[in-house]
Amino acid sequence: MRITNTLTGKKEEFVPIQPGVVRMYVCGPTVYDLIHVGNARPAVVFDVFRRYLEYRGYRVIMVQNFTDIDDKIINKANQLGVDYKTVADTFIAEYWRDAHALGIRPANFHPRTTDFVDDIVEIIERLVEKGVAYQTETGVYFDVRKFEKYGELSKKKIEDLIAGARVEVDETKKFPLDFSLWKKAKPGEPCWKSPWGEGRPGWHIECTVMSVKILGESFDIHAGGEDLVFPHHENEKAQAEALTGKVFARYWMHNGMVRFLGDKMSKSTGNIFTVREAVKRYGRDGLRYMILSKHYRSPMDFSEELLQDYSRAVKRVWEILGRYEKSGDIGIPKRNAVYEEYVNRFVEALDDDFNTPVAVSLIFELARNLSKAMDDNDREDALLYYHLIRREFGPVLGLFDLNEEKKEVSSEELLKLLIEVRDVLRKEKRYDLSDRIRDHLREIGIILKDTPSGTEYTVE
Ligand SMILES: Nc1ncnc2c1ncn2[C@@H]1O[C@H](COP(=O)(O)OP(=O)(O)OP(=O)(O)O)[C@@H](O)[C@H]1O
Ligand SMILES: [Zn+2]
């Protein structure tokens, strides 16, 4: 299997440190708002990448953090008049709702920064002892000029980095690119004790510490959006390698940016489309299909019309699958030459730098074949195509997955049925029963709203 490694800029054969096991760290969200379609891209891409590694027989140990303390979280807390923890807890819960709706499997570990403050302090102390970090009045900083390989990941010279990038401004630093490991608290800010006074960890050190503590000093894959290459990943790498003297992550994988209205989709710019809205309007398979039909490293332009097109294409496949399920056999087909050929094409595509566009196009090809086989009343072939879509490839791509998708469809259908029954009850003035339905739904977070054009529902 070959993947493009940002560290070398080349497509390389993937060989894990421990045979058969892949240790992988993905930078997770800073939790101060709902996730948007841009954030959904790494979530879906690396979820499917992990499923594929498992499909190929690896055991995967995956870590995805939550950044639960940061300036943006503190600002949001101040805006809302609550403490930072309420903001973090709220948006972690919201993250889970969206991730679940999007069919993202939880990683094996979801560490939160604030649970690792003791480890972070200990590692910063070791960096200070090694002479690669120093203290000023405002905090503790990493001394970039002490780490020779700085710039290796982002492939930039130090001079260019200073000129081109946004660097943390602080009068007390020795060098513009030095970045904070520990920020001393201003009055009223959340803080933890440390040898340098009360304060909080910088953003980059948390990922270094959580990855090294959970996965070890060297691990296989470090992933995230390409906006993180500099400074975040360059800094994570510098801290870890200055600390241990070993290679930190051996392969770095970065997804391209989702653009919306001409810019990177971003909470800070405000040009966002939330995952919640996208899934509600166009279904989770529509969004997953849109994301997977672009190669993960290419930029991706988002528009609602495009998402709608993908959602329609997905519906057509569902219709074909539904037609088959009404009458067809859903047993296990024979693994014949055609079966093998499809598996080979699937593996060949995904082994080649995780080419999901080719893999999803196979699903659509199979759906067309299935439709034709039904027209021709060719039962054996139909079962084969059906099986390949729903049991062989579906679970890897998280699309048309037999076990998962059924539940989603049926809960929506059931809700529609309940609303219909309630309408009948109201027309017959049996308000005791109709109110009971409304109240009970409200208790489980489904709010009904009666409008002149019918009853609508929202999920809280
Ligand atoms: N537009 C985008 N396209 C693709 N990936 C993105 C996009 N925006 C963020 N990501 C990725 O989503 C993950 C979580 O991002 P994070 O919560 O740190 O902030 P963010 O959404 O980029 O914040 P902001 O929107 O304020 O820039 C990271 O891996 C990041 O690279
Ligand atoms: Zn990170």
UniProtKB/Swiss-Prot annotation:
Binding residues annotated for Zn(2+), in chain numbering: C27, C207, H232, E236
NCBIfam families xrefs: cysS
Gene name, Swiss-Prot/TrEMBL: cysS
Record motif 'HIGH' region, residues: 29-39
CDD domains registered for this protein in UniProt: CysRS_core
Gene Ontology cellular component terms for the protein in this record: cytosol
Protein keywords: Aminoacyl-tRNA synthetase, ATP-binding, Cytoplasm, Ligase, Metal-binding, Nucleotide-binding, Protein biosynthesis, Zinc
Residue ranges of coiled coil: none
The protein's name in its UniProt record: Cysteine--tRNA ligase
Motif ('KMSKS' region): 264-268
Cofactor: binding details: Binds 1 zinc ion per subunit.
Cofactors required: Zn(2+)
